[in-house]
Amino acid sequence: MLNIDEASALANWIQNWKKTYKENPKLNECFTWFEWKYQDRELTSSDKSSIATILRYNSEE
């Protein structure tokens, strides 16, 4: 499960991506960013579910 700081960092990254590319990142791009940012963590199925939820929430106009 993602902690508050990780979730916030991911949400900020998604918002910055949208400003730069004028589209939402793909889910796999979010996974890749998270693995790059937190190299000491292995993504669990719970993490992936949380990331998908954060992406969905931040994809709304």
Locations of regions flagged by a protein language model:
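Short runs of predominantly hydrophobic/aromatic residues within well-ordered alpha helices
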Residues: A7-L10, L27, K48
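Short, charged early-sequence alpha-helical segments and their helix-coil boundaries
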Residues: R41-E61
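Generic L/I/V-rich hydrophobic alpha-helical segments across diverse proteins
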Residues: I14, L27, F31-F34, Y38, ...
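N-terminal acidic leader/helix
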Residues: L2-Y21
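Charged, low-complexity interaction regions
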Residues: K18-N28, D40-S45
